[in-house]
UniProtKB/Swiss-Prot annotation:
GO CC field: chloroplast; chloroplast envelope; chloroplast stroma; Golgi apparatus
Gene designation: HEME2
Subunit field text: Homodimer.
Known pathway: Porphyrin-containing compound metabolism; protoporphyrin-IX biosynthesis; coproporphyrinogen-III from 5-aminolevulinate: step 4/4; Porphyrin-containing compound metabolism; chlorophyll biosynthesis
Native species: Arabidopsis thaliana (Mouse-ear cress)
Protein name per UniProt: Uroporphyrinogen decarboxylase 2, chloroplastic
Length: 394
């Protein structure tokens, strides 16, 4: 057995976790090793030069790394005082997310404080809708609202092909600037919504608790839904390529609502379109890591693996060790600490991080939450999460 050494400033002594070794690829990247003292404990920190690949990308490939890379979904958001202050000046979410200056500023807020290994674009999966002739808004306290949800083949025919250079040039500008700001000290991450999840928002007219409208369409007019799914698929292929060409070093695909489908319906209304996206993107960007997240995906893990993505992001309802076994060792995993854990004590947070890292094993793991950071999460607890994660050594 190999030993994982974890040293944290919150513990009086080092904590040892046993990790079963798994085969890794050798890294050819050169790094400078810096040793510093933290409250009497020597911490070895790997300083990556701006010319070498970020830790997150090397981990996804299965290269030998000192620790798991870490970033958190919704790491830029309402739990941060700096974000709250900015919201007072710019109360509209779309004003904040559709302005390159603000997108860069907000995306970098957690980077400047916590130094995560992934810096994700501040945006929304619904951002492309306006450019597809689907009017929408995001209202504080209500969430997304889709005006005039499509209900027929004629309505779907009015949905336009997405041209990101014309519709969302601020996304490209923000990604280019983020790459320059982060300077390869972390991976710049883009993201898109998956076709079924986007269709769900559009058909339901916003968020939903029971998904009656999308299922009514799926089971009574499947051809209409398939036409909409194909339009979103083609558009998201274009959008991922645009993000990659603008500076994104990995892209996460959110299929948040796919788990509302039964396995057989997932295979009809989600899986083929996810596979189509992955295959098309890999033809033009073969080295771009694609991450897939689907909330509550325990019943679909094997099917998620069939999409061809490089990383599957697990939520907290799946045991990390069991999830790895079910997905297979060729796929990297991300996650999967319960976001609610961040309301606990620092000792509790530390123990859950250690448990997750131990179960994930030594390679091909990105430490993250199983969902986004919750509103009201203490900012100091997020800081502690990053501190503990960054002091882990395999």
């Amino acid at each position: 057995m190999s030993i994982l050494q974890v040293s944290t400033s919150s513990l009086s002594s080092s904590t040892l976790l046993s990790i079963s070794p798994r085969k890794s690829l050798s890294s050819t990247k050169s790094c400078r090793i810096v040793r510093c003292s933290v409250e009497g404990t020597t911490v070895t920190e790997r300083k990556v030069s701006a010319t070498s690949e970020p830790l997150l990308l090397r981990a996804v490939k299965g290269e030998v790394v000192d620790r798991p890379p870490v970033w958190l979904m919704r790491q830029a958001g309402r739990y941060m005082k700096s974000y709250q202050t900015l919201c007072e000046k710019y109360p509209s979410f779309r004003d904040r997310s559709e302005n390159a200056d603000l997108v860069v500023e907000i995306s970098l807020q957690p980077w400047k404080v916590f130094k995560p290994d992934g810096v994700i674009l501040f945006s929304d999966i619904l951002t492309p809708l306006s450019g597809m002739n689907i009017p929408f808004d995001i209202v504080k306290g209500k969430g997304p609202i889709i005006f005039n949800p499509p209900q027929s083949a004629a309505d779907v025919a009015q949905v336009r092909e997405f041209v990101p250079e014309e519709s969302v040039p601020y996304v490209g500008e923000a990604l280019r600037r983020l790459r320059n700001e982060v300077n390869n000290e972390a991976a710049v991450l883009g993201f898109v919504g998956a076709p079924f999840t986007l269709s769900s928002y559009v058909i339901e007219g916003g968020s939903s608790k029971n998904f009656t409208q999308i299922k009514r369409l799926a089971f009574s007019q499947p051809k209409v839904l398939h036409a909409l799914l194909q339009k979103f698929t083609t558009s998201m292929i274009t959008y991922i390529r645009y993000q990659a060409d603008s500076g994104a070093q990995a892209v996460q695909i959110f299929d948040s609502w796919a788990t509302e489908l039964s396995p057989v319906d997932f295979e009809e209304f989600s899986l083929p379109y996810l596979k189509q996206i992955v295959e098309a993107v890999k033809q033009t960007h073969p080295n771009l890591p694609l991450i897939l997240y689907a909330s509550g995906s325990g019943g679909l893990l094997e099917r998620l693996a069939r999409t061809g993505v490089d990383v599957v992001s697990l939520d907290w309802t799946v045991d990390m060790a069991e999830g790895r076994d079910r997905l297979g060792r060729d796929i990297a995993v991300q996650g999967n600490v319960d976001p609610g854990v961040l309301f606990g004590s620092k000792e509790f947070i530390t123990s859950r991080i250690h448990d997750t890292v131990k179960k994930a094993g030594r390679d091909k793991h990105i430490l993250n939450l199983g969902h986004g950071i919750k509103v009201g999460t203490p900012e100091e607890n997020v800081a502690h999460f990053f501190e503990v994660a960054q002091e882990i050594r395999y």
